């Protein structure tokens, strides 16, 4: 086994922008805007929920105080400073047009410009690189998703490089959202979607066959389906695995860290990566994720380098950025 070490350069490709909002940031905005959000916090000031459905309600309630592009500028600065503190050199965050101007293209442009400005400032100050992935919200339905897809297509470029879908996986089917994904694909955006977190292996198959994505958010349910694992490998699809989130929410294939399927997938040469999903909701960060992998599975620099290089390979960014990231990853983990 490699010696445990979690202080190298990290790459994160599954991070919900609003879901990364520190609770103190949301509480302050709520106070300033005179919005009562007391029910979504516990007596320590953290987010509170007892099920995935309640988590979604808490998440969306927190978003109600994120009302202006300036709010998102400050949120982005807070998120990226937190990322930097855990050794993250590159992150992709999911940005929902539904929470940024209610999927109005003109308003979305203003929100996205503020987020990009904050990302540029963070890059200048800390060296961290950020790219955005616009996302539709599954439980808001296919028609609303089309609006998000249009927002994404109209703003595709060097900063907004991908399109995806989050939300409640139990609602509808992946194929219901083909139109939104087709718009994004035609605009040159790279594609991912949440699948196989709650919806079983069939949800992953639908994502691959109906939406033609190159990455799967979570995807851990594939552990139940050897044929699907082989298809994922053959298609070179990357899984954006979020172990701490899965354990915190009680996903059936991950009742504990020791039973999480990431090691089995890694050992079968599936392209897995590690991210935090909605870190303050699940009391995690990328340092903790790596530390838990080290403590649970004995992973160290060699394994973490593979995880990080998998993320670089799957990142929705240009070749030159990937080259720089790969050099930093290898230097920090294996000193070559």
Q: Residues of each region from the PLM?
A:
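Metal-cofactor-binding active-site regions of metalloenzymes
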Residues: 1-189, 198-203, 210-215, 221-238, ...
């Amino acid at each position: 086994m490699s010696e445990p070490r979690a202080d190298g350069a990290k790459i994160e490709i599954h991070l919900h922008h609003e879901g990364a909002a520190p609770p103190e940031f949301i509480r302050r905005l709520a106070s300033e805007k005179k919005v009562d959000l007391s029910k979504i916090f516990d007596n320590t000031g953290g987010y509170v929920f007892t099920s995935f459905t309640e988590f979604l309600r808490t998440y969306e309630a927190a978003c109600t105080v994120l009302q202006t592009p300036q709010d998102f500028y400050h949120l982005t600065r807070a998120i990226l400073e937190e990322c930097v503190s855990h050794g993250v050199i590159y992150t992709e965050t999911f940005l929902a047009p539904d929470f940024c101007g209610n999927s109005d293209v003109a308003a979305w442009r203003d929100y996205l410009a503020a987020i990009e400005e904050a990302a540029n400032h963070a890059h200048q100050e800390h060296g961290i690189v950020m790219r955005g992935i616009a996302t539709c919200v599954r439980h808001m339905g296919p028609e609303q998703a089309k609006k998000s897809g249009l927002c994404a297509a109209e703003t595709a470029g060097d900063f907004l490089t991908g399109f995806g879908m989050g939300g409640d996986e139990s609602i509808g089917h992946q194929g219901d959202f083909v139109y939104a994904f087709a718009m994004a694909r035609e605009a040159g955006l790279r594609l991912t979607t949440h699948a196989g977190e709650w919806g079983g292996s069939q949800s992953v198959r639908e994502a691959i066959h109906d939406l033609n994505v190159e990455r799967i958010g979570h995807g851990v349910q594939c552990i139940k389906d050897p044929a699907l694992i082989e298809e994922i490998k053959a298609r070179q699809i990357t899984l954006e695995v979020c172990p701490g989130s899965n354990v915190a929410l009680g996903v059936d294939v991950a009742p504990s860290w020791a039973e999480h399927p990431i090691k089995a997938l890694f050992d079968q040469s599936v392209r897995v990566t590690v991210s935090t999903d909605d870190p303050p909701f699940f009391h995690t960060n990328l340092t903790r994720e790596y530390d838990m992998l080290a403590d649970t599975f004995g992973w160290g620099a060699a394994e973490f380098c593979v995880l990080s290089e998998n993320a670089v390979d799957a990142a929705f960014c240009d070749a030159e950025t990937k080259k720089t990231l790969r050099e930093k990853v290898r230097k920090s983990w294996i000193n070559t």
